[in-house]
Amino acid sequence: MSIHISAKQGDIADKILLPGDPLRAKFIAENFLEDAVCFNEVRNMFGYTGTYKGERVSVMGTGMGMPSISIYARELIVDYGVKKLIRVGTAGSLNENVHVRELVLAQAAATNSNIIRNDWPQYDFPQIANFNLLDKAYHIAKNFGMTTHVGNVLSSDVFYSNYFEKNIELGKWGVKAVEMEAAALYYLAAQHQVDALAIMTISDSLVNPDEDTTAEERQNTFTDMMKVGLETLIAD
């Protein structure tokens, strides 16, 4: 057991999908994994291990925001030996060419958080994806015929931001979308020398306000990113 995860050693696979929403973790386990067993219910942050196409994989919720994903990802890496971590979550488009239900693969993650500068006050440490996972995910998504964007995202500490116009301006600099976790995940992966990738589905748009989705859709659909994430985890 770790502080926030009740699993025993061996309960968690060395490769894992990390949705923010624990109910999305439950959905993935019930709809994509065979012989899924729940290994965590602490704080209702559900985690499951099963098999996907014969490969042992896990899925677990992380909650919202960088502090929350930092807790769960660190314990998964340090206490349970997880080596591949793929975030599957939602994001808001910052770019007029990136639309609702399309995929974004976060090649890198800018951030307005001080979570990394607490460790490196003299540096702007770049948070980047593992290239092998990124490359595999891109080709898997394209082979599925999914509209997929690759590039920088913004990991924000604030959902209801007072810097709306600044965030929009980032879209003009090539930033694809805004979300709340990728930078912290990539930083932990660099710190512990494991592989990480963030795959997001666009759930709404800051530049095309007529594009949005319901809370139920966000929980129970968006299966494209789940398929890409699972296929990427088991790819040779």
From Swiss-Prot:
SUPFAM superfamilies membership: Purine and uridine phosphorylases
Assembly information from the UniProt record: Homohexamer; trimer of homodimers.
Biological process according to GO: purine nucleoside catabolic process
Function description: Catalyzes the reversible phosphorolytic breakdown of the N-glycosidic bond in the beta-(deoxy)ribonucleoside molecules, with the formation of the corresponding free purine bases and pentose-1-phosphate.
HAMAP family: Pur_nucleosid_phosp
Active-site residues, Swiss-Prot/TrEMBL: D204 (proton donor)
Recorded GO MF terms: purine-nucleoside phosphorylase activity
Binding-site residues for a purine D-ribonucleoside, renumbered to this chain: H4, E179, M180, E181, S203, D204
GO CC, alphabetical: cytosol
Residues under site feature: Important for catalytic activity: R218
Annotated organism of origin: Streptococcus thermophilus (strain ATCC BAA-491 / LMD-9)
Gene3D superfamilies: Nucleoside phosphorylase domain (3.40.50.1580)
Positions that bind phosphate: G20, R24, R43, R87, V88, G89, T90
Record's catalysed reaction(s): a purine D-ribonucleoside + phosphate = a purine nucleobase + alpha-D-ribose 1-phosphate; a purine 2'-deoxy-D-ribonucleoside + phosphate = a purine nucleobase + 2-deoxy-alpha-D-ribose 1-phosphate
PROSITE patterns per record: PNP_UDP_1 (PS01232)
Keywords of the record: Glycosyltransferase, Transferase
Family of the protein in this entry: Belongs to the PNP/UDP phosphorylase family.
Protein EC: 2.4.2.1
Protein name: Purine nucleoside phosphorylase DeoD-type
